[in-house]
């Protein structure tokens, strides 16, 4: 992705994530207007999942997922993170691996970033480690399709059974 603008990198990540979700047999919806915190909606039937797409960098054995956005104001930069009122999940795409990873908002809300480990740490730390494979898009969607509970089904506005039945 060398030489691409940030917008082009974001568009490439969205396209790769959209393709991966469609290959899993799901429908992807795109908002007609800009300005929302989510990039895509994944139809899990009957639930809708608001997804923020991210391009991730690999540094050694770690995927670094940035979860903070910034904008410049007259008073300086303003940094914001994501919440369950805005999105239901972050899907991070790694062009180096050509794979996507789904992170429920319950695990990343308010955070500046998350590291997903691809290989064990050199210091053998295992406590608090997020293994990338545990968050693979295929595995996470498979759990959701099999009716297994996951934190992301209990978070966010569109995942509320009351709101789904009222649509």
Describe the predicted segments one by one:
Residues 1-29:
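Acidic-basic catalytic patches of nuclease active cores, encompassing PD-(D/E)XK
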Residues 97, 101-167:
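Non-catalytic C-terminal interaction segments of nucleic acid-processing enzymes
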Residues 24, 36, 86:
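Short beta-strand or tight-loop elements
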Residues 17, 21, 40-42, 47-57, ...:
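Conserved catalytic cores of phosphodiester-cleaving nucleases, focusing on short active-site segments
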Residues 31-35:
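Catalytic phosphate/metal-binding cores of nucleic-acid and nucleotide-processing enzymes, i.e., regions
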Residues 20-22, 49, 65-82, 118-125, ...:
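Conserved functional hotspots at enzyme active or ligand-binding sites that engage polyanionic ligands
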Residues 36, 47, 96:
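A generic "binding-loop/recognition-motif" signal
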